[in-house]
Amino acid sequence: MHDARTFFMRGSCTYAHPVAIGRFFPLSSPTHTPQGTLMKSHGTMCSRNALLLPRRGAGLHVLTPRIREARPVNTGVKVILSLFATLVLMVGVFFCAPRASFAEFERHFYQPTVLSALSTNLREVSKASEAWHSRYRPLFSQFCALDAVRSSFDPAQKAEDITQRAREASALLSSVAGLKGVRIVEAQKPNIHFSTFESDVLLADSGSVTYRKYNAEEHDVPLQFLGEHSPEPKVIIDEYHDALLYSFPSLGNYGEYRGRILFYLSLRALGTHLIAENKLKITDSIVPLSADDYTFGGIVIGIPHEGVRSLKPSVLAEWKRKQFRVQTVRSEQHEDWALLSNASGAFVIAQAVPVLLFGFTPLTKGLVAMVAVVTTFLLVFQLLSLRQDPLTKLRDRLIHFHAQLLHSCLEQKESLEWEEVRTRLEHRRRETDAEMKKSLPRRLRIRRGRELDALLSKGWDDVFSTLEHGYGGARAMNRAQIEQLVREVLAQSLASGEAVLPVAMRADTADEELDEVLEELPDEAASLPSDSSPEEDLDPLEEVESIEGTAEESTREYAAAGDALLSKTPQLSTHSEYVPATLAELLGRNAEPGDVVRDSAVLEYIEGVFDYRPCCFYESHAVHDCLEVVTGEDGPSLSPMESIVSTEDGLFTIRVSKEEGNHLNRDFKALVDSVLY
């Protein structure tokens, strides 16, 4: 047997057991109204989906169930799932094989990128060097073709030839940047016939100059490697002079081969040119390397001189095989270098970079790991977001559909009659909603049917409410203005995605749940008194006495139950779109003293105001119970702050004197909002 403290939970709502309700307030036959199924008992009515509990004092406490709608997966859930998937993937990759993961990433992605950038820069350096090298060849050839230069091998030379040869050599030295000097060497004997190097001069007077023997100090390039008997110029890397040695053939007056003319061009001039062309950095050094037979050679950029000497054998071996691939070498200081080479016409140009440049630093590894985590998270989140919420699609369709529907209803009219428009829209409402739902998948209609109905109903109700109450001039608006208005209203009301269940849906749900509870009642529940008929006309004074007696008995039982019942009360939220009226309009019609409110119009008014929340707590008092609340010294002075008393958990009570009236109009909602909000 259940008593007044018997409760059970269903969903997210708290319900009082119907047996306890029957003991406090006998239930009788239901009455059906347009707003839902109502229950009558002793002249007081409430909605079927609202359960009545006794309060301390007179009256009844109405407990309104709150229906929780199923919501789609929101962004927060997607973020949590994405983070979890990312964490699992990163743990598997970076903790199971951290070294292999970074090594593979470096080998397949990072190293090719670095190598491509270095190779591109090296090709640019080679092109600039070749252009610089080719620019001076014509100047050297012109010097070799001079008669004064050709006659340098004659036994008896004219004074004017000696003077002109010296003058032309000085002009060449001043015009070619980085030109160290010029030598004319005999082919058969190591004799120097002309030189601009002061170290080569042994004796000089006004008529003649005596030069030393070529290669006397054993640091010059041997004659046999200068390209003897070769009619073509030859470029040699001279490590001792840190220069490019241009060896041109010297021909006699009759075209016979006589010797070689040597031009020494400094490598520093090449470095200065490359820096000016923005191909090298100022800190980059240029080191020459040449084979022992001077058949090939080149320059290395980016490594100190002392480091190159130890790398010379391995580097020259690669150059000799003409395999210009990436080469890893180690210096005497145990430093690993990566060498990139490129053939540039007459010689090879190589660039040396530390091997560490091809690997990740600890900071770079941390950055790569962070980027990988963020990228994985975004990919998983995008996969979870690929499928658009069907309700969002339906919302977009509603925005366009309602405007088109108005257009079809008013296609033949210049001025609008709002009642006619409303009638047409109401006529098409059910049919249109059915077609909308039919276009959605069957599984969606079954699982989220309430949300679909709520979304459709919310769209229609907001349009009607706004056109009727918020825009009183709708009758004079043209068709374009109506369409724009509907679009704005739907976009604002549906964009939030919070659809509220209509009254009928909530009432039906509560009916089903209450019927299930009644089926579970023991047989004793059937014997509860329910002989009060809604059509029975009782004397007003008898009804007052009956209600007061019931209230006193309920108060005693409620006090025994304790305050735990109130702690289960859900909050009833309200919102208003109406402007509060004067106090005289709030009370409606007057009634005789001692009357008890039992007209169904009271509940109809309340349900009309609370269109999506059909239940509220209405407390009736006799005249002597509320004179101190309703009346003042000079007569009735009802005010919102005095007539509405806020109770626990957001429910409220209105105390109305029978002299002031027994009907509540729609402005009762505005009165409630003025106090609670």
Curated annotation (Swiss-Prot):
Keyword Transmembrane (UniProt): yes
Membrane topology label: Multi-pass membrane protein
Keywords, ordered alphabetically: Cell membrane, Membrane, Transmembrane, Transmembrane helix
Compositionally skewed regions (Acidic residues) per UniProt: 533-546
Disulfide bonds: none
Gene Ontology CC terms, in alphabetical order: plasma membrane
Domain of life: Bacteria
Keyword Membrane: yes
Segments passing through the bilayer: 80-102, 338-360, 367-386
Region (Disordered): 523-556
Main location: membrane
Compartment list: Cell membrane
Official protein name in the record: Uncharacterized protein TP_0593
Native organism: Treponema pallidum (strain Nichols)
Source taxonomy: Bacteria, Pseudomonadati, Spirochaetota, Spirochaetia, Spirochaetales
